[in-house]
Regions:
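Short beta-strand/turn micro-motifs at beta-sheet edges
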Residues: 53-60, 166-167, 321-324
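Conserved P-loop NTPase motor cores
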Residues: 160-196, 205-213, 224-229, 345, ...
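P-loop NTPase motor domains
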Residues: 108-164, 210, 215, 219-225, ...
């Protein structure tokens, strides 16, 4: 019956049963057993399961009279005929013997009502253990109408046309969510759609990315967008010596070349000293000058590591400037970290003639320390915002931003701290072919911390998303039936899964507002230059019209 519950057909299934005389019932089963034995069909005998009932040495099982009816409904005769044939076909595929009523049609209809035993026409014997074996009506997930933040984020339409109440949080009230899919699968569109629907909670949003496709969306929800130079110093964002210690571990390369116990002791005291400094005075140049490294046996090596870090121009600029970027409650802040990614580094890096390979490696490692330090301090500052209002940390293209060696041992602390402060992480992940990241210990650990997973099909052949997402055999079988062009995707939450749809066909402007391509961004910037006002009320309608007509 579960297969029928998934069908796009309205019906009522009714089961009627009442206790039967034991002797009469066992005689009926004995007659059936003799007929089957005469047929010499051993498989049929095994399938029917009559022998164990007839030959049981134990107390006779309890018997009952049983009738099951399925009443199918439709608005026209033709549609009714079609639906009857559809349900009948599904029952046949599952080996369920059934008949279509004609002469007894009226009696069978009235027999569905309580107490109308005189109208029952198709009863048969059954053992009481088989009663009420239709299906649990709650078997098909419907989500939760309310979560920790209030009403559900949105309502998706399932593949069967039923509603699914979508929430970041599961039944344990943990809301970390990961959106996974291949290139051009619609990951950003779904992520930003969920963010727009979550605006009813008035959340504080920190949006970390390495691309510009969400720029129109962020500005449309009155957020601020930061490209290129970052107007903040990570040292000034941290509010505890423990967090400063972690930051110093990151920028001194501890996760690539472990610090000794003596070096850890030195940077621990350094973190305490920096904590006593006013946030606006925390520049690495000043710290190196003021802190007495000579008092520590490993002071010289720690100082050397810090100097090596700020010998890089980007590192020096970030860690020696004043902070003007403020993360405030109920605000939306987006930061494009493209200039700090491996891709941008490889695009701009030109090795010197005769340069040793380790120089490239060391510079890339310094970039990893810088990017990790920036992200760590931003997340810490964001997590500890005083407001109890919802917080959403978005990490777009997570594998391009997160350095797994650094964050491997930090993700548990980060996810738990955000949850305690009414926050969630919404990570967006593009799965690429032959990328070892998705087989790493970090990725396996990350999946465990995400209570909700949204998994999108892809056009890339032989891309093992089911394996990467650790789907069960049943889940993988279902996921592999989804066409990439169907606009369907899988939501996995609370040990259940459901296939839902986000169909924006016919709404090109909304799709582009959620995730803009390069030509859309160019059009947006032209309109902004013409209008000269950043307020969404001044430009949003014009941009919408242009996007709608540019399809």
């Amino acid at each position: 019956m579960s297969k029928c519950l998934h069908a796009p057909v309205e019906f009522i299934a009714t089961e009627i049963f009442y206790f039967a005389d034991q002797v009469k019932a066992i005689n009926s089963y004995s007659q059936q057993s003799k007929v089957i034995s005469a047929s010499r069909d051993s498989e049929l005998a095994l399938f029917k399961g009559i022998e164990p009932i007839v030959n049981s040495d134990n107390t006779l099982p309890q018997f009952c009279h049983q009738q099951i009816s399925i009443m199918i409904m439709a608005d026209s005769i033709d549609l009714l005929e079609s639906r009857v044939a559809y349900i009948s076909q599904r029952l046949v595929k599952q080996g369920i013997i059934h008949v279509r009523e004609d002469i007894n049609l009226a009696q069978t209809f009235w027999s569905q009502l309580p107490g109308n035993f005189n109208y029952i026409r198709r009863v048969s014997y059954n053992i009481i253990d088989n009663v009420a074996a239709l299906a649990a009506l709650h078997h098909y997930p419907v989500g939760m109408q309310h979560s920790r933040w209030g009403r559900s984020v949105t309502i998706f339409r399932t593949e069967c046309g039923t509603p699914y109440f979508m929430n970041f949080h599961d039944e344990s009230a943990k809301g970390h969510t990961c959106i996974i899919g291949g290139a051009q699968s619609g990951r950003a569109t779904i992520a930003n759609f969920l963010l727009s629907e979550a605006s009813k909670y008035s959340p504080t949003i920190l949006y970390l990315t390495n691309r510009n496709n969400a720029q129109v969306f962020i500005k449309g929800i009155e957020g601020t967008w930061h490209n290129g130079d970052l107007p903040f110093n990570p040292l000034s964002y941290l509010e505890s010596s423990d967090d400063l210690l972690e930051l110093f571990k990151i920028i001194t390369g501890n996760y690539f070349n472990n610090l000794t116990d003596s070096e850890i002791e030195c940077i621990t005291e350094l973190a305490i000293a920096v904590m006593d400094m006013p946030p606006e005075s925390r520049s690495l140049i000043k710290i190196i000058k003021d802190f007495n490294f000579k008092d520590y046996s490993a002071g010289a090596s720690v100082k050397k590591r810090i100097k090596l870090f700020i010998s890089d121009d980007k590192c020096s600029k970030i860690f020696n400037q004043s902070s003007t970027l403020e993360l405030q409650d109920n605000n939306v802040t987006a930061i494009n970290l493209a200039d700090y990614t491996d891709y941008q580094f490889n695009q701009s890096y030109t090795p010197q003639v005769g340069e040793k390979p380790e120089i490239y490696h060391n510079k890339l490692q310094t970039l990893h320390c810088l990017r990790s330090g920036i992200i760590f301090s931003l997340i810490k500052k964001f997590s500890l915002l005083a407001s109890s209002e919802p917080k959403i940390l978005v990490v777009d293209n997570m594998p391009d931003l997160i350095v797994e060696q650094v964050f491997m041992n930090l993700i548990k602390q980060i996810t738990e701290q955000l949850s305690e402060n009414n926050g969630i992480i919404l990570s967006v992940v593009q799965v690429n072919q032959n990328d070892q990241f998705y087989y790493s210990d970090f990725w396996k650990k990350w999946l465990k911390f995400n209570n909700t997973k949204i998994i999108l099909p892809t056009n890339i052949r032989n891309l093992p998303i089911a394996e990467i997402c650790n789907l069960s055999t049943r889940e993988a079988k279902k996921f592999n039936t989804i066409s990439p062009n169907s606009r369907l995707f899988m939501v996995k939450q609370d040990n259940n899964y459901v296939i839902v749809e986000l169909n924006l066909e016919g709404f090109p402007a909304i799709r582009k507002l959620l995730s803009a391509e390069e030509e859309d961004l160019n059009l947006f910037h032209k309109i902004m230059q013409k209008i000269g006002d950043d307020a969404p009320s001044a430009w949003l309608s014009d941009v919408y019209d242009q996007f709608q007509n540019s399809e």
